[in-house]
Amino acid sequence: MVAAALAFMASAQPFQSVYYPSKLTASTITRVHQRASALRSADENIHAIVRLCDEADLDRLAADYGVAFNVVTGNLATAVIPMRSLVAFAEDADVENVDAGNTVRAMTDLAREYSQVDALHGGLPDFPRSFTGKGVLIGVIDTGFDFMHPAFRDAEGNSRIIHVWDQSGRNGNTPSMGYGVVFDTPELIRSAAHDVSRDTHGTHVAAIAASSADVYKGMAPESDIVIVATDKSESGIIDALAYLLDYAEKEKKPMAINLSMGTVIGFKDGTDPIASMIDELLDKSGKKCLMAIAAGNEGHRNSTIVTEATGQGEVINTSFTPPSHMRENIFIGCSTTSAFQVTLSLVGSDGVAFETSISSDVSESVSHENITGEKDYSLVTLSPMKDADGLQRGVSINLYAPLKDGQKWKLSVTGAAGKYIACCDYGELDNGSNASTMAATACGQIPISVGAYVSRDKFTNLQGTERSSDWTVGERYPLSGMGPAFDGRDKPDVLAPGAHIISAINNYAASYNVNREDLAYTEVDALIPGRTNYWGAMCGTSMATPVVTGIMALWLQANPRLDFDHVRKLIGSPGSHIDAKTGMESLLAGVELPKSKNTVPYIYNPFTRSIVIIGEGVVCVEVFAVDGTVLKRKNRPVEPVHIPEGAMRIVRITTSTGSHILKI
């Protein structure tokens, strides 16, 4: 079957077109071309999300093609595939498609004040005790970590980063996922000092959620931190989430997970494979861990078209010019499985220089090289796309092509009745809007999607220069990704402070990843001779998301059984500003309290089997076996009281005015 109809100017030399089975998506084909042009070794691997047929034999596939499968949810699996066997693997009858996906990209001072976190840290008079994240894990999936920054040390100078998986690392212990390295002791973490990346994004994000430094303290300064330094692939994100969920289960501790990275384009209704797999993993875990995902920073771009068609005909007609790097990714999706036709044309003053078409229901993908007839290294790749349910109702386009003066791309979509979406990754569509610009990664049903509002419109940098913007404090950060989702849900779920946020900077970052003009504070390290630490300002939903993650850690400290449905009630209607104090008041009001006004409120933590007292006046906490044997007695406990293992335990909480009995 011919997947594309091609036309080009009579004066041009024929360009090269290569047809592939539709099992290889546009992004996968593009990745293959990029590695081939860079003369990369065929022994290298490609990370992808694979759709498997029903009852596929994973053991056979692994043995035949050298593929390592990691996370499997339904018919979707993350996999590490040798480049040399990629095509043969994709053509196997047990494989429906292989999608390398697009590269994920990055999406506290006043932040604490605006989100009312300081009231939780302070305890009295606002609350009967302080909430700082103690006993709670914060998992961060990101890149560019400085493990040695004082933002991540406790009062004794010990690192609060207790476990690291660097997916791109090469020297060290390999985790169960089969790639990268693990640092799981204080000595290994200290020796590594940082992940492979030369970025600073992860350091900034993690410190917003959990910094314990006196200057620019984070939301949950006494939480323990677990890091996955991602390789920036969609499959790597899924593997990271599964890894963190497994770690929390082994440690028997509640965890709040932060993802300030993602992919922009896709179905944007929760049926993109990455969004669906995130939902599936959280659901399988019993929703014991909470997760916040950045809504993205595309709210300033007219990059999306959403339209309804009532009958057969042209439903989208638009044009676009890629940014200066001449790259663009386009996604077109439909609410139904009715086939639609996509035509992409390169036009200029002298007519059509190149044209290609693809139908959403075909069984082939196609790539075109050197589309001008000259060796310009251009590459245009098109493929049909399936959603997480296996319904083929999308088309993906990846392109790179240098344009001549006056040239632009035209995109036409013809189809039957239904709702359609077209969105681009980097630039704008000429008749697009900024509605539904939030990241496809953040459109799942379960995680909390986070947008950003402005909490600071200016700051003074290290040079003494005031850096300011024309943003309005309290209003939506202009770049914050907007809803609704393609299926009509209001998104994002909540807004949090995201501009300008001052937080820790990675000492090991490459100079091109740190804008010196944005550095706002520095101090000499108290423990490491010769080291100077830095803090700087950054903006975006990447910064807003760890505010929410850290606040959820505080709420988990108060109630370790907190779930996503309850969190949504605490944060209010979609688009509300996060308010940690009001949320905690609502949370504590719903905690099971002893009926007598003479007793104090408590919380039982099932993860650690401990009683947490959240009121004053406790004289003693006693734990008994059912035969009356005293197993434990704590006078005036400050720390949580652990309940020994057993079929049933009786706990008596005695105060100066009475006592309360409970069974565990």
Positions of predicted regions on the chain:
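Autoinhibitory N-terminal propeptides
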Residues: 5-129, 137, 150
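C-terminal subdomain of the subtilisin-like protease fold in secreted/lumenal serine endopeptidases
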Residues: 34-39, 250-263, 267-270, 288-295, ...
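Short coil/turn motif common to extracellular beta-sandwich-like domains
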Residues: 43-47, 326-329, 604-612
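Short, aromatic- and glycine-rich surface loops/edge beta-strands on solvent-exposed regions
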Residues: 89, 330-332, 407-415, 648-656
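Subtilisin-like serine protease catalytic core
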Residues: 124-237, 252, 256, 286-290, ...
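Extracellular S/T/G-rich loop segment that most often corresponds to the catalytic His/Ser-adjacent loop
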Residues: 170-185, 302-392, 396, 402-403, ...
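Short acidic/polar inter-strand loop motif in beta-rich domains
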Residues: 387-393, 415-424, 656-660
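C-terminal outer-membrane/trafficking sorting elements
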Residues: 594-664
